[in-house]
Amino acid sequence: MARIIRVGGASSETSWHEALKDLRADDVLMLGPGFYYLPQGLTLTDITIKGTGSVPEDTTIEGYISVSEDSRYVTLENLCINTSTDNNSLFVPVESDGYLTLRNCFVKGNGTDTAAIAVNGKITVELYSTKVINGSVSMYANASFRLEMNDSLIDYKSDKYCALAIEGQGTAIINNSNIHGSINTFAKTNAELDINNSEADYILLHGQTWMNMLNSTVRAKDDSCLYLSDDCWSNIMNSKFNGGVYIDKKTRTIIQNCTINRMVVINEAKVTMSNSMVTAHSDFQDEATCEATRVSFMGNMNYEYFLALSGNAHLRGHDLLLHPNGADLAIQDEAKLHTNVIADKDEKLSVECNKRPNVYILGIQWTAKKK
């Protein structure tokens, strides 16, 4: 039978260490405000721990926690876990098969390459109104996972490590959350990634990743704030990218109602775009193809070309809007452009091309030139 055990505060029934010695499956441990020390860590099996303070930091566990191999669930609520040693704040072993749930928690890693939350095995991880700082949330290669992240924050900006690492097999759902750092998948990843109403600094996808992205923002202004590679499939809607979108290899990408600063598409990547805007520079190379409908390709003085095609790239457009803003359009090598244009700020368009028959633009006066 489940027991409610109170530790700390006026209604305390037992001491912290006595409670730990007598923990049983399905116990609910109620911790009053204060600091609770676990220098050797703690392994939990089918336990719920709740802080009774007004905010998570009122009830702080100094140390680290592991989920046992045979645990069905571990639930933590209204707690702060502060890990100052080189340990995972929360660790899920390979043999696990259960749930790890955090509600209104604050997890502090030690700021090294050690993940704050390390996930292996078969596990559902639920983060609700939870903050993770100074460490990553990492799904490792041997994990079969489901991650649900709602109204939560991961704050781990690093030039070497990502804030949310997704390897292994599973599904990650990120709703109304904020990632200060990068979201990464890897060569061995086989996962679905759903990002809704959220923000991240970078998103870098590899392996076999299926991404659905809605009403979200990627903040970084670097050339690859969004990087799609390998065999990734992506469906992106109503989102904004402050930097560059870089797409390569055999990716398949659908972009709808989005604003992108600049984009580069190479190799055998295929892109379908509609009702979107690229504000500075677009570059299609190699065997890349793009179907674009009601897309605005714009330029600025930072780039020689506002739109460039080379190799055997092919852009087929429908009702495009071209705004060069002083930049040129380049169709090089065997690349082809076939489109009609419905609006343009300039009366004339200058097209740098090697083979005039490879350029078909209807709806605007254009002039071919050689570099």
Segment roles from a protein language model:
Residues 48-51, 73-78, 100-104, 124-127, ...:
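All-beta strand scaffolds that present successive hydrophobic residues in beta-strands
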Residues 2, 26, 46, 71-73, ...:
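A general structural motif
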Residues 2-32, 37:
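Acidic Gly/Asp/Thr-rich repetitive segments characteristic of extracellular carbohydrate-active
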Residues 15-23, 36-44, 61-69, 88-95, ...:
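Short, T/G/N/S-enriched strand-turn elements that build extracellular solenoid repeat scaffolds
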Residues 4-8, 40, 45-46, 57-65, ...:
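Extracellular beta-sheet-rich ligand-binding/adhesion modules
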Residues 8-12, 46-92, 109-111, 221:
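Right-handed parallel beta-helix/beta-spiral solenoid domain characteristic of secreted/periplasmic
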Residues 80-172, 176-179, 185-189:
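Right-handed parallel beta-helix
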Residues 321-371:
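Leucine-rich solenoid repeat scaffolds
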